[in-house]
UniProtKB/Swiss-Prot annotation:
DNA-binding region location: 162-183, 209-232
GO MF, one example: transcription cis-regulatory region binding
Origin species: Escherichia coli O157:H7
One GO location term (cellular component): cytosol
Record function comment: Positively regulates the expression of about fifteen genes involved in acid resistance such as gadA, gadB and gadC. Depending on the conditions (growth phase and medium), can repress gadW.
Subunit note: Homodimer.
Transmembrane intervals: none
Key word Repeat present: no
Keywords: Activator, DNA-binding, Repressor, Transcription, Transcription regulation
InterPro entries (UniProt xref): Homeodomain-like_sf, HTH_AraC, HTH_AraC-typ_CS, Tscrpt_reg_AraC-type_HTH
Domain called HTH araC/xylS-type: residue spans: 145-242
Protein name: HTH-type transcriptional regulator GadX
Amino acid sequence: MQSLHGNCLIAYARHKYILTMVNGEYRYFNGGDLVFADASQIRVDKCVENFVLVSRDTLSLFLPMLKEEALNLHAHKKVSSLLVHHCSRDIPVFQEVAQLSQNKNLRYAEMLRKRALIFALLSVFLEDDHFIPLLLNVLQPNMRTRVCTVINNNIAHEWTLARIASELLMSPSLLKKKLREEETSYSQLLTECRMQRALQLIVIHGFSIKRVAVSCGYHSVSYFIYVFRNYYGMTPTEYQERSAQGLPNRDSAASIVAQGNFYGTDCSAEGIRL
């Protein structure tokens, strides 16, 4: 038997199916049941094609894509380690995700497709009140992740330490202390989030510099250019030109995609129709 730790598991029962918990308990499922579970609480010894292991890194990329109001980032009471959603129809994409998950040498496009399909499967559980608490219990996100989640859900907002602390249900002094323990600050994270978003809008979406500045919360275009140059070592226009010429930049668009910094993307199960 293989015990899985530090990840989550999505299992799909095409027929009657049994999962064994680490405490020896058996959980029985009917055909059409889609299961989301804390992988550290599950033992898997057969039917590998029936489950997809979702890594902590992938889950961490899914979290910031959720709407701010959906996240209760304070301490949660103990929640179930397993959730079930019964699907009225077959899930044709599940087999593809399972096959991609077994392949250790995915091409770049396949990696992105696998991630997108996993996000779609995860979104099936969004209406379950226990999903977010379970997700957070597994991830136990650090303060950096929590702050970035708040910022990225409204990147253009005039964020202050007090406002972010309010969203996280804590005092500004406590937030400042926790960020200091992680060797960062709210202002540093605000700049990082805005600069990553700016790069996406410039390189991938082709926005004008003025539009990028406004979209990222900068009222002054000249100040935005100043911050961008300090962060990336060149102006936004220079970055655009180098990208158009195929010259290497310090942070390429491809690397940003690989890191998953697409916080503005909507995630839904539209198209799966479960």
